[in-house]
Amino acid sequence: MGSGAEASVAERRPFPVSWDQFHRDCRALTWRLNAVGPFHAVVAITRGGLVPAAIVARELGLRVIDTICVASYAHDKQGELQVLKGVSEQTAALGGGTGKGLLIVDDLVDTGKTGRMVRDLLPDAHFATVYAKPKGKPLVDTFITEVSQDTWIFFPWDTGLSFQPPLKDGAA
């Protein structure tokens, strides 16, 4: 995720999120978004935004879901951003070309680099994330849980069930 003086993955605070907790957090996000809408469509930032976008779209009753693919992570290192796939012309037209009435959803805003790039493409869209870190938080319109910048979130789709040693044995 980071480079240089930033903490390595091993030095970060682990924050495991279960499927149940993630679903509850997405529903809480939707509850907040309900007061902000209405929205014409959901735009998921792939890949992390796919699952929360599906939950949010269901809860808001939205059927139009599009994706924007911005790549910044290679395993545990954060690199240069690239838009690998933009929103469709149909979705962009729903937002008048500026994103008005579109809801951008991602799992997390970290440094804000991805959010800035998407904001540049859809400046009038509403940007929502489930989790937010301090550096990226100013870019997000709506989020549920703030975590510290040195936190590494383990999302349920990135983890498997395995034995965890007790904390007294030096487990993180």
Curated annotation (Swiss-Prot):
Pathway: Purine metabolism; GMP biosynthesis via salvage pathway; GMP from guanine: step 1/1; Purine metabolism; XMP biosynthesis via salvage pathway; XMP from xanthine: step 1/1. It is found in: Cell inner membrane. It catalyses: GMP + diphosphate = guanine + 5-phospho-alpha-D-ribose 1-diphosphate; XMP + diphosphate = xanthine + 5-phospho-alpha-D-ribose 1-diphosphate; IMP + diphosphate = hypoxanthine + 5-phospho-alpha-D-ribose 1-diphosphate. Keywords: Cell inner membrane, Cell membrane, Glycosyltransferase, Magnesium, Membrane, Metal-binding, Purine salvage, Transferase. Mg(2+) binds at residue 107. Pfam families: Pribosyltran. GO terms for biological process: GMP salvage; purine ribonucleoside salvage; XMP salvage. Its EC number is 2.4.2.-, 2.4.2.22. 5-phospho-alpha-D-ribose 1-diphosphate binds at residues 47-48, 106-114. The keyword Aminoacyl-tRNA synthetase does not apply. GMP binds at residues 110-114, 152-153. Guanine binds at residues 110, 153. It is a peripheral membrane protein. Purine salvage pathway enzyme that catalyzes the transfer of the ribosyl-5-phosphate group from 5-phospho-alpha-D-ribose 1-diphosphate (PRPP) to the N9 position of the 6-oxopurines guanine and xanthine to form the corresponding ribonucleotides GMP (guanosine 5'-monophosphate) and XMP (xanthosine 5'-monophosphate), with the release of PPi. To a lesser extent, also acts on hypoxanthine. Homotetramer. This is Xanthine-guanine phosphoribosyltransferase. It comes from Rhodopseudomonas palustris (strain BisB5).
